[in-house]
Amino acid sequence: MRNSIFWWIFLGFMLSLDFYVFQALRVLTNSAGARAKLIIHVIYWTISALAITMLIILPYLHFTQQNRVVRNTFFAIIVGLFFSKVIASIFFLVDDLRRVIQWAAGKLFFSNTEGETMEQGVKISRSVFLSWAGMIVGGGLFSSLVYGLSNKYRYRTHRVQLAFDNLPAGLKGLKIVQVSDIHSGSFTDKAAVMRGVDKILKEKADLILFTGDLVNDVAHEMDGYMDVFDKLKAPMGVYSIFGNHDYGDYHSWPDRNDEHKRKEELAGKHLLTPMQQANLDKLKDVHAKLGWRLLLDEYVELEKNGDKMALLGVQNWSSKARFPKYGDLKKAYEGSQDYPFKILMSHDPSHWDAQVKPTYPDIDLMLAGHTHGMQFGVEIPGFRWSPVQYVYKEWAGLYEDGKQKLYVNRGYGFIGYPGRVGILPEITVIELT
């Protein structure tokens, strides 16, 4: 990361933000005494310097259990300060644009004296107001992100009843628990994670389905949590799929070199490196040791009360260009045509619009995750919003189109920002009727 051009660009942008926000701080402290002004400025630059230092150190903190807390703390502070300053800067930018337009108008349409008089009459009140507004909104965002750190293990159970006209009588009342996006590499509190597993077990579900992203990057992230998640059991079994993070695409593999990139160019597609493939094989073993049946572009037959259904599971497949397409729904679907009811597990919800609806109208229910609801948003009765909705049309909860349904789980774990604001971690309980 530290060698990537993105990291240097981000570091430069952080420094630019620090100086830009400081200009607004100078406006607000202009009337303060010299001592008070000095103290405020020193505090500001101390915090900014610490954030920059954390950003520089972060890439050197290799993944270990001991480093998880430090990495999460550093990342939370960096992200919190960054977005708070970005939001605050929008207000400051409005003020700067206003002053530029006002100055230009004064030069073009008024005499110098008239322009200066107009500027003097409004610049202090408007500049101070917008500076205060920016600081308050930015501070409010930072406060909400700090509060959100306490929500990362506040598991919320969402209960949905789904009615299907073609559901066989023997499957009516089937109880499914869906879990998604565990991201075990982010956890720092094993007891809290276990409390979530206990909530799942208390549901006494017939079937438990996990829709991908067991780890952030590498299989050994699960080393300390095998004895937590191997407790997930259900009469009809526990089934799982891979998500985009499970392939290790975001990890710096030593053998992702020029030679490997040439192989990708010749193949015309993304290829796993040998080390990456070995890691994926280890992760397959993790699923097996947990007692989970990992579905890799295939289906299994499930039966209850004499009636049968098909459960399909595909590897990660996204309509978004930044995510490689590993899954093969055609392969998974082959042979399941005659089953009266079908459930598909596919990690990325964009799969629903891109392939499932137009090509497989007899897939009754798709279960997905991936979005996390961006771990930030607002959910109140009658209103739901998150920035992720501008990227994903289906990003949380239930969606219906004709006889087909999609449910997007908000995620059990977290990645990046180690918290949740408004969008809490989810355990989904589905009853088929």
Where are the regions a protein language model picked out?
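Non-catalytic terminal accessory segments
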Residues: 1-153
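Acidic, His/Gly-rich catalytic cores of divalent-metal-dependent hydrolytic chemistry
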Residues: 18-21, 31, 55-57, 61-68, ...
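Acidic/histidine-rich helix-loop elements
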Residues: 176-191, 215-217, 248-272, 318-324, ...
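Conserved beta-sheet core of the metallophosphoesterase superfamily
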Residues: 349-428
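Extended active-site neighborhood of metal-dependent phosphoesterases/phosphodiesterases
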Residues: 160-163, 226-314
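Active-site neighborhood of phospho(di)ester-bond hydrolases with catalytic His/Asp-centered motifs
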Residues: 177-180, 208-212, 237-244, 295-297, ...
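Beta-strand-turn-beta hairpins that frame and shape the catalytic cleft
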Residues: 163-177, 292-293, 299-311, 337, ...
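Membrane-embedded segments
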Residues: 153-158, 170-259
